Every structure is written in C-alpha cells, then in structure tokens.
Amino acid sequence: MKASIGGNTESTGKEHLIYFGSRTDFTGFDDDTREVPGLIDIAFKNGQQINSANFSATELQQMGRALVNAPLRLLQREKTPVDGGFELSGGFSHDTGLGSLGVIAVAGYDNSWRAREGFQEEGQFQGDELVPVTSYAVESNQNDVRLNFLGGLSLSNDDHEVKWTNLYVRNTTKEARSTAGPDFDAGGGIIRNDYTEWFVRQLFTSQIAGEHHFMDGALEIDWRAAYAKTSRDAPYESRFQYGVDADGNYIHNVQGNLISFSELDDDNVSGGVDAAYTLPLSNAREAIFSVGVSSFDSNRDAERHDLQFEAVNALTEEQRQSRIDYLFSDYNINPSTLQLRE
C-alpha cells in the first residue's frame, strides 16, 4: 500500500474559483446531481427538439425548472485543498489439481488541483497586420480525480495456459473558469464568460487468451478474445455571459448562456484463433503448417444537445444585475420571462 500527499505554491491553500457540484465529486463520481432531468431525457431519446413548436409553454417551464441551479452554476471562491492519492496492490499464486493459479490486483486513486491565471487572445489578419479580436484575462481552477484498477487471473500447467486481464481507468475533470476582457469583434465592450464543467473519460478493457499444446507439443493452438469500451460524458457543460453597464458593473447577457449535454461511446470487440502443426522431416528439418483467423468489430455513438434560456420579454435591470442562481431560479422560468429551448 502506498499513500501520497502534495501541493504547489500557486494552488494549494490559496483562494480560487470553485463551484459546488455534488457532495461526492471528490470520488470522481457525482451523486446523480448531473443526471439529465426526466422530461429533457425523454425529449433527447425521442429526437424531439426542445422548442415551442414541439412542447407547450407549461412543458418548457417544467423542463427549465428541472435543471439543477446553484450547485452547477454559481462560481465561488474557496481555499484549494492539498493533493492526495493512494495505491493498493496484491497477488498470490497457488498450486491446484489443474495447475498453478495466479491472481494479481492493483488499484489507485489520485486527486489533484491546478489553478491557473493567464491571457487568451484571438486575432485575425487585416491586410498584412494581425490584430486582436478578443483579449481575455483567464482564471481557472481544475480538479482531476483519477481512478484505475488492473486485475489479472491465470491458470497454467505444462501444456496449457489461460490468462484473463481486466483494466479500468476513469479520469474526471471538474473545472471552474472565468474569462473577461474586451471583445473587439462586438464593438470593444467588456465581456465576461463563466464556465462550469464536468468531464468523465472512462476506459474498460477485458481480454482472455489461451495457449495449448497437444501431441507432445507438435500441435499448438492459441486463441484470444477482447472487449474494450471507451466513453466521454460531459453533462451540464455550462456557460453564462455578462456585459458591463454604464457604472462598470457586470450584468447578464442572457443570450450568451449555454448548457450542453454530450456523450461519446466507443465499443470494440475482437477475437482470433491460430493453430500450428510441426511435422518432423528429419533430424535437421521440419515443416510447420499454420492457419489463423481473426475478427474485429467497432461501433461508435456520439450525441450532443445544446440548451439555452431565452428571454421572452426584456429583462428588468434588477434581473440583469441579480446573482446567477437568482436570475435562473424557478420564479423567473415561466412563459413570460425565461424559456428553455434547444
């Protein structure tokens, strides 16, 4: 068993951006806070675009109110904790009536934080001159949780060996980010974008293989079968935008909000068999006859949905100046104020 603790001078113990998320985020798994709400999930699965043409105002209101508010939208500042991790490993071998049985297992957990500040610019050529289009100050705080497991099982004797290996890797990234600066493409006004994100990348692979010898080793048969699945899940990938009023205070640009749900799954199945027969021709020569067959099948599915709250009527100054979770509270999600659309 191994355990580790660490930190760095820029992140650990200093106040940086965070958002709450769910109570179990530190494990790399959330507590279903980020599950797609029922009515929205049904619309996604049925291929119905979420808009006023396909759903009533009451249904759109229910969908909008079903989206998680403050825990996934409100940026705050807290002291960043230390990094930590541990690793467990073990194994054994044991002689049985069928042969030698071996087992090995390794599991690990790592939790790290990385805070960054910098500048992000986009430019374009005007003639021979490169001029900035946007120039943003960027502040980010990223929490990465990595989980891994490796397990192996084998059984072998003089003529036969079978091995089964499983690998699971999960990498979860939780990031709170804010960018602010002039957007010269939109008149040079100050724009601020706040982001809350949660990305889950997973890999699972299982492989079983065998090697067998018959006829005093003259006939050898090797076989293998494998399954691998990779996935990327990004629920509630959110952006909320602000402009600046005459007094220099940030106010909501409600048309700049975006809440995205995306998934990607990649499945691979493969297998094969090889056989070889050795025919002695003399003490110095032999002939080897071999044959083999293999197959591979791959399937990929990807899906993405972008949701946005649109202002049905002009927002009041009080609404535009309110906190993010107040503006998108149930009180303001109704047929006359904010309405959800895809």
Predicted features along the sequence, with ranges:
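N-terminal periplasmic accessory domains that precede
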Residues: 1-4, 18
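Sequence/structural signature of outer-membrane beta-barrel proteins
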Residues: 8, 112-114, 171-173, 230-232, ...
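Transmembrane beta-barrel wall of Gram-negative outer-membrane proteins
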Residues: 44-178, 201-208
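Flexible glycine-rich, low-complexity coil/linker segments exposed to the extracellular/periplasmic environment
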Residues: 9-79, 248-255, 301-342
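Face-selective signature of the C-terminal outer-membrane beta-barrel domain
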Residues: 156-167, 197-342
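Short linear interaction motifs
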Residues: 68-73, 187-192, 253-256, 268-272
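Outer-membrane beta-barrel domain signature
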Residues: 75-78, 138-140, 189, 193-197, ...
